[in-house]
């Protein structure tokens, strides 16, 4: 996990794949099971132009630019704007650690395979560098020129050393000598002291000192400690802030250290000092050997991660040319990987400012409602009794996760009639009540199976800890299938009811994480349907045993079923559209997801558009599809909704064939070829009506969003002067607890 919040947690990272001409190409030594052949297309791709795809890396940068647009929006609560500045920064860190690192590896290996839009790895790196410099500079300016002055108007100041009076400097001198100086280690560079290792994402001061005797100059590096606050608060605040709020004055800790460099280098003259920060390659893959303990292999690779090669160097834009040249040489960084920042580096630290107790400067508190099916009554029913009466669709965070999905697992753990609980865990919270319930169930003698995905990027250490805690409690812990990540969100409860064994299920789009469930928009299906129960039984058997199950009754399961299943449904939609006549306009596909990249799925949508099927895509992040282009995508629109909550659900609707699907898979190579993913059909008309309503709200012409044009540019919509509604606010008002 990077930063204090994974608001944009799934930033579409993963191994950089060769996209053309073989979208299923694998690297030498890759033991990932081969993906099945694609469904037979209704028409050949010869009818589609070569330039039909947008670049996925540049599309991701456009997504992060939309996050930045939220920070620049002065109609947003002020501390929420600071939060989005922090999110932008941590997003970009992760993008460089994984996506850019993967492209660099391919370039260095001489792999010349083109991306789907026809660019070599080197060409993509060049464009990424140019675009990153633009948006990183804008990011710094939004903070410096807009958010920072606005914070000052509210009595929240981020000051410089020059702004301080003598009393404040004396106060900070005491703090420095007591709290900071003991943990600083100045590292000189000379023939006896090689250039020190600089850890990834650490903030550092590059210092030049001069010897008074002979004028000789030397370089030294001082690491800014990460165990002290980035922003040091000055004491003695008053209440002269807006509406009587306390005044807060903060000094960046690197400024404090810089002010006391003479203490670190006594007897030396400080010539210059500049902040810098490097990002290292974190794009490693665990070599999975059937004869080796996966936990040990992963821990070995995690230890190596911190020593990855540098992929980005961030410097203050006033760094001297000589200092920059020294850093480039010693850190072995290409000049094209330098990002010059006009202001403070590493604004992910703004989470500290966001944490101030200033509710008037934040979004209004929202308390999720309990789903009506699970509402407390005079004689409360168990969730099992409720599900026997019919399926329930929960929409988080508008409906509470803790009183629905979490309670489902907790009731199962406490119910003496429950025989077994089986669940997948991809990312979970540090004090997870779900994991606690599984441990309680195992200690009570139930059969508990947890499929823990310990390879979930940047959450590996946390998942290893939970895996060991579960094992110690007697839970049967499995790590899935060699070569695949288990990303599906599924839970199965087996319960004895008299002479009958009944299975209860949950299939969702989001993680079993009670904290992110308050921040991420997701949907989940709770059901006692026998066919889904049988399907999940087969799925868990394949994950824990040697089953080679490839087909299911009511599920689509990757890596062998989702791509082909979706393309088949697109083609059935085309057939139904043509059967009723294009004039009837019956063909209509609506898709909501985090990312749309897979070329085979995109081509199927293009072919559907060419015969008149209307296609509406709501995509939060990457979109490689080019909508609205003459000749192949005139009938396709794509929009992106960003806001208070991370839009995370994956929902598919094929109107002519009357099918709704939800699940964990985005339309990306990694999800469809290298992960275990599950999509489930929602059949109950009561629930499909809820999904239809969700689409209607998201696709309302008045909904605030960004719309994608055929040129790859995202434009804010509706245009100024038009009526605007906020999709998420509308849903909050509808679900707000009394």
UniProtKB/Swiss-Prot annotation:
Its cofactor is Mg(2+). GO terms for molecular function: ATP binding; metal ion binding; polyphosphate kinase activity. It catalyses: [phosphate](n) + ATP = [phosphate](n+1) + ADP. Belongs to the polyphosphate kinase 1 (PPK1) family. ATP binds at residues 91, 520, 620, 648. This is Polyphosphate kinase. One of its GO terms (cellular component) is polyphosphate kinase complex. Residues 1-48 are annotated as: Disordered. Catalyzes the reversible transfer of the terminal phosphate of ATP to form a long-chain polyphosphate (polyP). It comes from Mycobacterium marinum (strain ATCC BAA-535 / M). Its EC number is 2.7.4.1. Mg(2+) binds at residues 427, 457. GO terms for biological process: polyphosphate biosynthetic process. Keywords: ATP-binding, Kinase, Magnesium, Metal-binding, Nucleotide-binding, Phosphoprotein, Transferase. It is an enzyme of class 2 (transferase). It comes from the Bacteria. The active site is at residue 487. An intermediate of this reaction is the autophosphorylated ppk in which a phosphate is covalently linked to a histidine residue through a N-P bond. It holds the Pfam family PP_kinase_N. HAMAP family: Polyphosphate_kinase. Signal peptide: none annotated. Residues 19-30 have a biased composition (Basic and acidic residues).
């Amino acid at each position: 996990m990077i930063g204090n919040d994974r608001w944009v947690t799934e930033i579409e990272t993963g191994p950089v794949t060769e996209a053309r001409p073989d979208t299923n190409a694998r690297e030498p030594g890759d033991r990932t099971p081969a993906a099945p052949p694609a469904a037979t297309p209704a028409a050949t791709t010869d009818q589609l132009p070569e330039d039909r795809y947008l670049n996925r890396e540049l599309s991701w940068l456009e997504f992060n630019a939309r996050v930045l647009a939220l920070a620049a929006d002065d109609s947003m609560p002020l501390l929420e704007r600071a939060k989005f500045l922090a999110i932008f920064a941590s997003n970009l860190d992760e993008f460089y650690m994984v996506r850019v690192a993967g492209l660099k590896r391919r370039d260095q290996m001489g792999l010349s395979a083109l991306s789907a839009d026809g660019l070599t790895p080197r060409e993509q790196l060049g464009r990424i560098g140019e675009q990153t410099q633009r948006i990183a500079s804008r990011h710094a300016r939004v903070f410096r020129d807009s958010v920072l002055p606005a914070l000052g108007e509210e009595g929240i100041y981020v000051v410089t050393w020059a702004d301080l009076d003598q009393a404040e400097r004396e106060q900070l001198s005491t703090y420095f000598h007591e709290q900071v100086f003991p943990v600083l280690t100045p590292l000189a560079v000379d023939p006896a002291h090689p250039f020190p290792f600089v850890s990834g994402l650490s903030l550092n001061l590059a210092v030049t000192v001069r010897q008074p005797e002979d004028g000789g100059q030397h370089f030294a590096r001082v690491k800014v400690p990460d165990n002290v606050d980035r922003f040091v608060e000055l004491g003695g605040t008053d209440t002269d802030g807006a509406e009587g709020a306390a005044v807060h004055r903060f000094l960046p800790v690197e400024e404090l250290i810089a002010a006391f460099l003479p203490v670190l280098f006594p007897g030396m003259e400080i010539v210059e000092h500049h902040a810098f920060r490097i990002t290292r390659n974190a794009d490693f893959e665990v070599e999975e050997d059937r004869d080796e303990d996966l936990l040990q292999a992963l821990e070995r690779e995690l230890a190596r991660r911190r020593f990855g090669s540098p992929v980005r160097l961030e410097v203050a834009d006033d760094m001297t040319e000589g200092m920059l040249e020294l850093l480039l040489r010693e850190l072995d960084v290409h000049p094209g990987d330098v990002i010059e920042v006009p202001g403070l580096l590493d604004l992910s630290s703004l989470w500290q400012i966001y944490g101030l107790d200033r509710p008037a400067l934040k979004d209004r508190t929202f308390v999720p409602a309990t789903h009506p099916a699970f509402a407390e009554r005079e004689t409360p029913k168990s969730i099992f009794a409720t599900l026997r009466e019919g399926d329930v669709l929960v929409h988080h965070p508008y409906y509470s996760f803790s009183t629905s999905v979490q309670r489902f697992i907790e009731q199962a753990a406490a119910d003496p009639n429950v025989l077994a609980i089986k669940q997948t865990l991809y990312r979970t919270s540090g004090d997870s009540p779900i994991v606690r319930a599984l441990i309680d169930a195992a200690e009570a003698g139930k059969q508990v199976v947890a499929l823990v995905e310990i390879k979930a990027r940047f959450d590996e250490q946390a998942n290893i800890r939970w895996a060991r805690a579960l094992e110690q409690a007697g839970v049967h812990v499995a790590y899935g299938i060699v070569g695949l990540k288990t990303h599906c969100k599924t839970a199965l409860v087996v319960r004895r009811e008299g002479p009958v064994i009944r299975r209860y299920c949950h299939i969702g789009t989001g993680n079993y994480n009670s904290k992110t469930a308050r921040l991420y928009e997701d949907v989940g299906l709770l059901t006692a349907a026998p066919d889904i129960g049988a399907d999940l039984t087969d799925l868990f058997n394949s994950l824990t045993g040697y089953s080679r199950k490839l087909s299911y009754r009511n599920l689509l399961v990757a890596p062998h079923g989702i791509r082909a299943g979706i393309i088949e449904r697109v083609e059935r939609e085309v057939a139904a559209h043509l059967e009723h006549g294009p004039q009837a306009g019956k063909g209509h596909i609506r898709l909501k997801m985090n990312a749309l990249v897979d070329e085979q799925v995109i081509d199927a949508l293009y072919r559907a558009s060419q015969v008149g099927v209307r296609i509406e895509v709501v995509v939060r992040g990457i979109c490689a599809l080019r909508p609205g282009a003459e000749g192949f995508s005139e009938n396709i629109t794509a929009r992106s909704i960003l806001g208070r909550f991370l839009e995370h659900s994956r929902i598919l609707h094929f109107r002519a064939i009357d099918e709704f699907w939800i699940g964990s898979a985005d339309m990306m190579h990694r999800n469809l070829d290298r992960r275990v993913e599950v999509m489930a059909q929602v059949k109950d008309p009561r629930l499909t009506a809820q999904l239809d309503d969700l689409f209607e709200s998201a696709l309302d012409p008045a909904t605030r969003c960004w719309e994608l044009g055929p040129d790859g540019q995202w434009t804010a919509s509706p245009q100024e002067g038009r009526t605007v509604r906020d999709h998420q606010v509308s849903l909050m008002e509808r679900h707000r607890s009394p």
